[in-house]
C-alpha cells in the first residue's frame, strides 16, 4: 500500500500511497475492514506483512524477491537488482509467531499493525548474498528504477506485544540457495519434486500439528 521513497520507517498513521491495481485493492480492503469494525463494533485487526519470504518447495512457490534472485542465478546466469530499492524482509516463521500473538490476545489496542523486521536491506546487498551462497559466477545486473527506500515500521506491534523478529536473513538466504541448488531441475526445468512417503504424509498433515501445537 506504499510506494516511493521514505527517509524514515513508515508508521501505520501514514496515509497509504501505492501504485497499481494490487495496491488499490489492498487499500480498499483495509478500508472495508475498518468500516465494518466501526459499524459492527467488532474486534477486526488488519496486519500488513512487510516483504514476506520463505524457502520455496518448487517453482510455483517462487513468489518473493529472494527466491526470484536465486532462480535467476540458476536459470539465467545473472541476478537483477535495483540500486535504489531498500526494504525490510520478514521470514515466514517470524510472521507465524507474530500472527499467533495477535490471534491469542483477547484485546487489541489498535486495529492495524505492521509486521516488519530489522532486516533492512537493499536489492544490491540482497543480490550479493545470493551470489555468495549460490557459489556461482553469475553477474549482478544493476538498474536504477527510482523506487527508493520503503520500510514499514514494526514499532507499534513490538511495543504492545514485546516480540521482534529472530530470523537471520543471510542464514535464510544460505538455506534457500542450498535447497534450490539441490533441486535445480525442479526450479529450472519444472520437474516434479520426488519426496519419500513420510515427507508426503508430513506435508499433508503438518497444518494440523501447527494448529494443535503452534510453538
Give short role names for the model-derived ranges.
Residues 2-4, 47-64:
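Flexible, glycine-rich beta-alpha linker
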Residues 18-30, 63-67, 88-89, 120:
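Short-chain dehydrogenase/reductase
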Residues 1-23, 38-40, 57:
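Active-site "gating" loop of Rossmann-like NAD(P)-dependent oxidoreductase/epimerase domains
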Residues 45-47, 113:
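Hydrophobic/aromatic beta-strand patches that form the interior of the parallel beta-sheet core
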Residues 50-52, 58, 68-90:
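A conserved pocket-lining segment of Rossmann-fold NAD(P)-dependent short-chain dehydrogenase/reductase
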Residues 81-211:
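C-terminal substrate-binding subdomain of Rossmann-fold SDR/epimerase-dehydratase oxidoreductases
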Residues 28-32, 36, 65, 69, ...:
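Hydrophobic alpha-helix immediately C-terminal to the catalytic Tyr-X-X-X-Lys motif of short-chain
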Amino acid at each position: 500500500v506504499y510506494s516511493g521513497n521514505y527517509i524514515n520507517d513508515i508508521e501505520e498513521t501514514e496515509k497509504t500511497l501505492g501504485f497499481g491495481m494490487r495496491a488499490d485493492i489492498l487499500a480498499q480492503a483495509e478500508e472495508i475492514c475498518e468500516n465494518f469494525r466501526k459499524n459492527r463494533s467488532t474486534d477486526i485487526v488488519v496486519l500488513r506483512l512487510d516483504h514476506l519470504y520463505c524457502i520455496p518447495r518448487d517453482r510455483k512457490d517462487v513468489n518473493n524477491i529472494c527466491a526470484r534472485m536465486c532462480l535467476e542465478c540458476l536459470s539465467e546466469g545473472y541476478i537483477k537488482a535495483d540500486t535504489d530499492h531498500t526494504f525490510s524482509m520478514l521470514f515466514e516463521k517470524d510472521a507465524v509467531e507474530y500472527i499467533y500473538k495477535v490471534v491469542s490476545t483477547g484485546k487489541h489496542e489498535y486495529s492495524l499493525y505492521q509486521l516488519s523486521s530489522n532486516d533492512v536491506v537493499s536489492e544490491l546487498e540482497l543480490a550479493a548474498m545470493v551470489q555468495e551462497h549460490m557459489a556461482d559466477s553469475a553477474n549482478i545486473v544493476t538498474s536504477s528504477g527510482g523506487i527508493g527506500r520503503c520500510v514499514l515500521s514494526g514499532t507499534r506491534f513490538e511495543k504492545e506485544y514485546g516480540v521482534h523478529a529472530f530470523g537471520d536473513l543471510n542464514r535464510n538466504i544460505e538455506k534457500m540457495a542450498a535447497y534450490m541448488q539441490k533441486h535445480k531441475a525442479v526450479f529450472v526445468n519444472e520437474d516434479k519434486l520426488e519426496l519419500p512417503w513420510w515427507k508426503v504424509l508430513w506435508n499433508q498433515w503438518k497444518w494440523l500439528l501447527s494448529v494443535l501445537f503452534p510453538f
